């Protein structure tokens, strides 16, 4: 404890300040924009031929303009798919007008007419363009310029083909719900029957009488869409239905093996603690179990699955032994190898070199907040570190894995981008040798010096349960240990998340602005956050919010004992799950937190979607106390300090309902509060053209300065 106190009491490090950070610098002027870097594997890259898009017109003679997106056809280099007039839908989905461009004769063909479509793709053989329009999966045959409908029963809020329903898109993190087979003979797709899913409606304040937006959103305990997987035979125009146990289940992924006739359907029960991979025949839909994993809490779903080109093995990551590691299994079940081990977690697979039988991956090592690059062979017996030390390394490899572009930064230093060569010596040992540096962010570093950016330090704080929590601290400019400063906790805290990271940007420009104003800014990763093993992350199972806020309270109490902290001026702010935490801080944490800002907060998990919520809490019927005991709505009578709640009225993710129900509880408890709402804004509450982003951050900043400021802060 004494060593920890001495570490915390170290003076703040910062550059001499000549300029003052303003909100305009952060949110309008782009003063701290990162240096542009041109990094590639080739020494000289011929510039792409310039195309005058203004000479192309649509069917009505209107200029199409510069495309929003250009999709190349790998099978035929002369073909490109253009997306124009793109509109966002939800977090991962958007719709556009589509055009097929042929660079050989500069011809332009509109695909799908004047109706906007989603998820356009070329087939692997370059014969077709697939897309989703009006909830139906469509195919455009390029040689004959004809369109065929794979499905015809699509209908808004009833049937979806080839695209996800809202909750799958948000929580299973994909939107395009179809996959081409490797050779392009088949296309597997999802069919969602969401007719039994309850609707949620949002008022859009867009005309004299407003409008009503309704969509299917299953809240905790509600019924889900009925999901079916079909495999369409492109050549014969026939389809087979994938066979699996139906009922209250999820299909979080489908993936093809290298065999054009073998689809893998990922099956999961509603509790999400059983995952099965079902090997499914393309022609008949018959299936058999390829892999099964069970967990006493829940199984994490991700895209870390590779079906190798040899047709015999697959690679994947799993927490089955307490930490996320890599495994190599045989498709016939005869081989089961754990390739990586230890108490440091694999965070990303950067590439699989099947020729040399090596896997390149990133680990949270040597500390949970660091990232380093490693390589391991398929036997798991030879492992080499390609980067070392504390900091954050991110890598992109070339096709043959002979080189990679390395992006390195740490919490106080902008990124350096370099080209690294993978070297294999005579004893087959592997290391990386730097070939060249593309950029070291000189302009940003100079700007940081001019504005006197402070240096954040990592801290470790004990909680009352015997764990030690990781955090970072940014002290005020010109820190004086004889003075008392207010503290602002910046927290997200949700399952598997991480804010205490040794990368540039973890401490934001806004944090630096607050430090210049005289605030101590702190972030602490509580119990339930990621990269410290399964048990630390899953301790919060069935009781979201309980241990998390107890950790934040412990950290605030600890800091409040330090002689340079104004214990009566400790605040907490967060967004989304972080807003849930801030609302708990001002209620259950009323003894230590004197102010809180909650932006777009969940205020009761009864109001949130079922896939996310039930993964950690099961259903409200099964776990009523878990839902209610830690809902800030049920603790408003404890509030002693100041509370600001902010929400967008068109938040499709965390509904505005959460704010209204919290305010209802505040009124009932006769608690004074402040609120702000942003009409027609979604969960991100953003917008540069209409000034929303600047307005929100200005309001929040001024409120914090006014409520938490003391004699040692600037207003």
Functional labels for PLM-detected ranges:
Residues 3-13:
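Sec-dependent N-terminal signal peptides
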Residues 199, 260, 394-715:
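Serine-hydrolase catalytic core recognition
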